[in-house]
């Protein structure tokens, strides 16, 4: 059994805290590591991919459409506006770093756990 299986609600290894939010609940700036599968038949949060969150988007990786879909999905997941989310690394790669403003680490971890638990 891996350490992730022992505490499936802890997703803190998938992101880093850039500012604020050190106490866990207060909003701050978080950078989430994601592994993206473009052109997916069923978009959504999948689970872990190493130390990243694996997500699927329907958009193709052409003209930034997959990145825009990632921003929309992560904003919905974190409960923030799309303007609070930006791809800051890996724009041309499946492995991306996504900056989220205005979300606490505990809130983000709980949202990820709920999304993974509710997937079919």
Task: Describe each region flagged by the PLM.
Residues 1-72, 77-80, 86-120:
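Contiguous, often N-terminal, cationic amphipathic patches that form binding interfaces
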């Amino acid at each position: 059994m891996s350490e992730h299986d022992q505490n499936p609600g802890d997703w803190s290894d998938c992101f880093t805290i850039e500012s604020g939010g050190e106490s866990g609940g207060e909003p701050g700036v978080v950078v989430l590591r994601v592994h993206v599968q473009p052109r997916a038949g069923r978009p959504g949060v999948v689970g872990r991919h190493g130390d990243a969150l694996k997500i699927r988007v329907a958009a193709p990786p052409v003209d930034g459409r997959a990145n825009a879909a990632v921003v929309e999905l992560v904003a919905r997941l974190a409960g923030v506006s799309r303007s609070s989310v930006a791809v800051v690394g890996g724009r041309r790669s499946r492995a991306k770093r996504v900056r989220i403003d205005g979300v606490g680490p505990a809130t983000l971890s709980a949202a990820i756990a709920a999304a993974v638990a509710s997937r079919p």
